[in-house]
């Protein structure tokens, strides 16, 4: 799979009128020639740098079950999702690794000795998993996540939606699963299809053998999204202005958004969003980072998977 780096913009100077010719002796002329050669070499180096920045790098990925070796990588990606929110990402990472019959991590295939010295063969480029919030109710991280989404729902939505979300999260007869799919920003979305296909197989197997996460009636997804700065996407205060287009960091999550029965956004503008593995650029238009919370019925997953196959099949 190939990821493409954005080419660096080079600022051009304003042309100046030529100076009058100046007489030089032979030594001065040699020095000028040497300086010109140095300038040529420097220009060549800059051109080579630009070529490197603009080149495509092909990396093959492979999926593995979650293990203790993946702790740091998974936790880092979870921190990228929750930012400064009061969520115990260490405990959440532990819970995901403990239930390693569910979920996968993606790593580079066969890191050779000749590759970049900074490349760690165990580096986690992304992961997918699911945590049954109903089964894990009472653990600190689960309580914190539920409080987080309810708090922002109260700030951004009508009272009826807050009550609806609270009811869904506390109905023990219809478990809600927290769907987590995080990856470096420059990992292409095509990787999502096999990851979700494998997750669906694992969830079906867990349901068949009565293991944790086996049955969820709803999926809760917190997605990294962006809107053009200054645009209002809140549903609490209706406006005649057209809502800004919502852009998804993980492109495939738009299909989940379309099937969600409950959804809202909240801003994370004040928090440090470093965008692991890359930087966002939308034609140099200032963007406001958001988190989009969605609740998707479990019986809609087959339709979503069909969409993923249609758009992400290589």
Swiss-Prot record:
Swiss-Prot/TrEMBL GO biological process terms: DNA repair; establishment of mitotic spindle orientation; microtubule anchoring; microtubule cytoskeleton organization; mitotic spindle assembly; mitotic spindle organization; neuroendocrine cell differentiation; regulation of cyclin-dependent protein serine/threonine kinase activity
Stretches for region Disordered: 1-56
Region named Interaction with BRCA2: 59-167
Tagged with keyword DNA damage: yes
Phosphoserine: residues carrying this PTM: 42, 112, 281
Region (Interaction with CDKN1A): 161-259
Chief place of localization: nucleus
GO cellular-component term (any): nucleoplasm
Entry keywords, A to Z: Cell cycle, Cytoplasm, Cytoskeleton, DNA damage, DNA repair, Nucleus, Phosphoprotein
InterPro entries assigned to the protein according to its UniProt record, in alphabetical order: BCP1_family
Subcellular location: Nucleus; Cytoplasm, Cytoskeleton, Microtubule organizing center, Centrosome, Centriole; Cytoplasm, Cytoskeleton, Spindle pole
GO terms for MF: kinase regulator activity; RNA binding; tubulin binding
Function according to Swiss-Prot or TrEMBL: During interphase, required for microtubule organizing and anchoring activities. During mitosis, required for the organization and stabilization of the spindle pole. Isoform 2/alpha is particularly important for the regulation of microtubule anchoring, microtubule stability, spindle architecture and spindle orientation, compared to isoform 1/beta. May promote cell cycle arrest by enhancing the inhibition of CDK2 activity by CDKN1A. May be required for repair of DNA damage by homologous recombination in conjunction with BRCA2. May not be involved in non-homologous end joining (NHEJ).
Note: HT1080 cells that constitutively express low levels of BCCIP display increased levels of spontaneous single-stranded DNA and double-strand breaks.
Family: Belongs to the BCP1 family.
Quaternary state and interactors: Interacts with BRCA2, CDKN1A and MTDH/LYRIC. Isoform 2/alpha, but not isoform 1/beta, interacts with DCTN1/p150-glued and ACTR1A/ARP1. Both isoform 1 and isoform 2 interact with alpha-, beta- and gamma-tubulins. Interacts with TENT5C; the interaction has no effect on TENT5C poly(A) polymerase function.
Protein name: BRCA2 and CDKN1A-interacting protein
Organism annotation: Homo sapiens
